[in-house]
Amino acid sequence: MIRKAFVMSVNAGCEAEYERRHRPIWAELAQVLKAHGVHNYSIFLHPQTRQLFGYVEIEDEARWAAIARTPECQRWWKHMGDVMPSNPDFSPVSADLREVFHLD
């Protein structure tokens, strides 16, 4: 399994709405994630900075990248675009994090 981590942010005043939209995520989006080899996916919020820390385990980088091309993912991005900084293609502004420690 490949471990990945990334950071995003939520717009000021939108924290509760961001959480509400994830409880739960759409069933069809969850199915796409699982079908593309996604496991153990979590997002954490740091309330003082509004930073979102994502952690996910994936089976394959190509399958992970392919999620972005699915209609479900693109629809989700548009749905979330008003509560978080987004790129022109509606994907969330994010930065990958480099692992500096791991203990099994």
Swiss-Prot record:
The keyword Isomerase applies. GO terms for molecular function: L-rhamnose mutarotase activity. Pfam families: rhaM. InterPro entries: Dimeric_a/b-barrel (IPR011008), L-rhamnose_mutarotase (IPR013448), Rham/fucose_mutarotase (IPR008000). The active site is at H22. Its main location: cytoplasm. Substrate binds at Y18, Y41, W76, W77. It is an enzyme of class 5 (isomerase). Its EC number is 5.1.3.32. Pathway: Carbohydrate metabolism; L-rhamnose metabolism. Keywords: Carbohydrate metabolism, Cytoplasm, Isomerase, Rhamnose metabolism. It is found in: Cytoplasm. It catalyses: alpha-L-rhamnose = beta-L-rhamnose. GO terms for cellular component: cytoplasm. One of its GO terms (biological process) is rhamnose catabolic process. Homodimer. NCBIfam families: YiiL_rotase. Involved in the anomeric conversion of L-rhamnose. Belongs to the rhamnose mutarotase family. This is L-rhamnose mutarotase. It comes from Opitutus terrae (strain DSM 11246 / JCM 15787 / PB90-1).
